[in-house]
Amino acid sequence: MTSAGPGRPRHQQPSRPGATARDEILDAAAELFTTQGYASTSTRSIADAVGIRQSSLYHHFKTKDDILEDLLDGTVSGGLAFARAVAAGAEGEAAPGSRLHAVALYDGTQLCSARWNLGILYHLPEVRNERFARFLADRQELRGLYRQLGGSAAGETGMQEAGGGDVTFRLVESLISLRADGLVTGDSPLQAADAGLILCGRGPELSAIRAESAALIARFS
């Protein structure tokens, strides 16, 4: 559980991005979790990185797990909200292939453009704990929307390959590892989305799909 209370005043000027001390704590934790590891990071080191007392941190987050939960939730909330909107709001208006491409491109862009590469935390042993059930459920729902759209996209081509959506989901999440290795470019999210559609049998229509996908992103984001 987290607290939105103001906490105690700091003894130095803010040195991190964020409108509030809570935002600065999240930014510091994200940096430390992704650079030195979750297990190796203490709440004291997070507080030191923000420039506040450890006791002040506890006004905002009771435990380190609370911080991790908030960060993990943030990695899927935007992509899931967009996928829900596209899956429901554009049904019957845009082709399934275009909707899958838009979801993949939007999701991949979020993963690649976030300040810290938080996706590398997905497979921490700690995340298997039931306290992270909300994050795990949201990620599973997002994966299910990929599958739904992928099945529809493949079905339109006469293919029976409903796994295209799941493969697209995995291609998008592979951007996390590519980013960790310094191999992500500005084109990487588009390349992942394109590859997913090709695997769904929609390669010949890719130019039209890209155009409709861009329109969906402009409309629903």
Give each language-model segment a name.
Residues 64, 75, 79, 100-103, ...:
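Hydrophobic/aromatic residues within well-ordered alpha-helical segments
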Residues 99-102, 110-133, 147, 166-169, ...:
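Amphipathic alpha-helical segments used for helix-helix packing
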Residues 24, 32-70:
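Helix-turn-helix
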Residues 80, 128-170, 194:
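Amphipathic alpha-helical packing segments from all-alpha helical-bundle domains
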Residues 21-29, 46-47, 71-83, 146:
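Generic hydrophobic, amphipathic alpha-helix propensity
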Residues 1-6, 143-159, 177-221:
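C-terminal peripheral helix-coil segments that are non-catalytic and often amphipathic
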Residues 7-11:
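Arg/Lys-rich, glycine/proline-spaced intrinsically disordered segments
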Residues 70, 84-113:
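Hydrophobic alpha-helical connector segments
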